Regions:
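Catalytic glycan-binding domains that act on GlcNAc-containing polysaccharides
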Residues: 1-126
Length: 126
């Protein structure tokens, strides 16, 4: 049960496409969780416009939850396959660490702040 809870938290908090290379630049802090998730969402919903995805991520909590779970299941499976000898706890730590490493600075922008608010609700309601 504890492992399952940790995995749920890690999967929702991470919301990064670990298989996707991130663009590293001086403005990396603005390349936030929202933008990473938005870009990764295009992979799952290629027929959706970015405007529609942005709207759904900001206004449809169920869509945001299902997208996060889908992206993060893929990410977690990636780590599990890459490190088969790691414990469940270590895999979760890696997923959370990847999230924290990319998101330590406060990103700017109303979209990001609203999206983080949606995700904190998701985190505590799950």
């Amino acid at each position: 049960m504890v492992c399952r809870t940790l995995i749920s938290i890690a999967l929702l908090e991470s919301s990064l496409g670990l298989n996707n290379k991130r663009e590293i630049s001086l403005k990396d802090t603005s390349y936030s969780m929202f933008h990473i998730t938005l870009n990764t969402a295009k992979k799952f919903y290629p027929t959706y416009s970015k405007m529609l995805l942005k709207y759904k991520l900001l206004n449809d909590v169920d869509f945001a939850i299902s997208l996060a779970k889908r992206i993060l299941k893929e990410n977690f499976d990636y780590y599990k396959q890459k490190h088969p000898n790691k414990s469940m706890y270590q895999l979760v730590e890696m997923a959370v660490g990847a999230y924290n490493g990319g998101m330590k600075h406060n990103p700017n922008g109303a979209y990001v702040k609203k999206f983080r608010c949606v995700y904190s609700q998701v985190h505590y309601n799950e």
